Amino acid sequence: MRGTVAFYSSIAQYRKYYAAQGFGAQADAVIAAAARKDTAAMLKAVPDEMVTTFAVAGTPDEVRERVAKLWQCADSMTLSPPQYFVAPARFNEYRTALVETLYQAA
């Protein structure tokens, strides 16, 4: 999910949103790295705390638990696998894991 957070925080229009959540400096670093087309620096500029603030990641049990907590305050969610800066084969693995974790009956 680091790549997804990096992608969205690289968009200047979202900078105020990230700043309001306490991640303005990190968003600035990602925006600067994106301008240089430095993907590695973009990913490095996103700390773990930023990933966990804006995305759900972890083991299947951790993801289910976190999503269940989010449903307590959300009336809708869009859940998608990591897709930015991820190899296509890896994206397919993540997509399968997401379906198996959240959408298949136990």
Describe the residue ranges of each PLM region.
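Active-site-adjacent structural elements that line small-molecule/cofactor binding pockets in enzymes
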Residues: 1-106
